[in-house]
């Protein structure tokens, strides 16, 4: 039977960039702002970080398809960095990867970072239904936020 991880992992710090229309800030500025706050909150040096997970969904509007920008922006060389995406749950997916790595004993301190910056890129929202969206994979009218809302409601009902 699976064993829980609640006694194996602790979140020791967190940071968040200032919310709002940040026209002057690039994605790497937002990432760095949140990272520095997290380091201060955790009272650790960045050299203590053993691995990182980087959540970004709309890569073309943000930082590209690779996880490399995270280690470049934060000056975190020589640690593994994994890029993840999972629609609206991408940030949670990054956190999940970091938590599982610590719980498994693969590292002592892991970093989870999520970043999206869409409004100043010309991005208008989910793609039109005629441009190869989820319509053929799921029921008509499916959108990721709607599906997550239904899953949340079903979970709360149980």
List each language-model region with its residue ranges.
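Short, high-confidence coil segments that cap the C-terminus of an alpha-helix
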Residues: 106-110
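A short, structured active-site edge motif that brings together acidic residues
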Residues: 80-88
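Conserved "HGTGT" condensation-loop signature of ketosynthase/thiolase-family condensing enzymes
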Residues: 1-81, 103-104, 114-158
């Amino acid at each position: 039977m699976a064993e829980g991880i609640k006694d194996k992992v602790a979140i020791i710090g967190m940071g968040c960039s200032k919310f709002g229309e940040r026209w002057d800030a690039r994605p790497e500025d937002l990432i760095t702002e949140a990272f520095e706050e997290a380091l201060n909150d955790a009272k650790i040096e960045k050299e203590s970080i053993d691995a990182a997970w980087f959540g970004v969904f709309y890569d073309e509007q943000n930082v590209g398809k690779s996880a490399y920008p995270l280690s470049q922006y934060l000056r975190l060389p020589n640690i593994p960095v994994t890029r993840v995406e999972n629609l609206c749950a991408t940030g949670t997916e990054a956190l999940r990867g970091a938590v599982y790595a610590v719980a498994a004993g693969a590292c002592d301190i892991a970093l989870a970072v999520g970043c999206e910056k869409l409004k100043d890129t010309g991005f208008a929202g989910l793609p039109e239904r005629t441009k190869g969206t989820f319509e053929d994979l799921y029921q008509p009218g499916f959108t990721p936020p709607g599906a997550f809302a239904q899953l949340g409601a079903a979970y709360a009902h149980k």
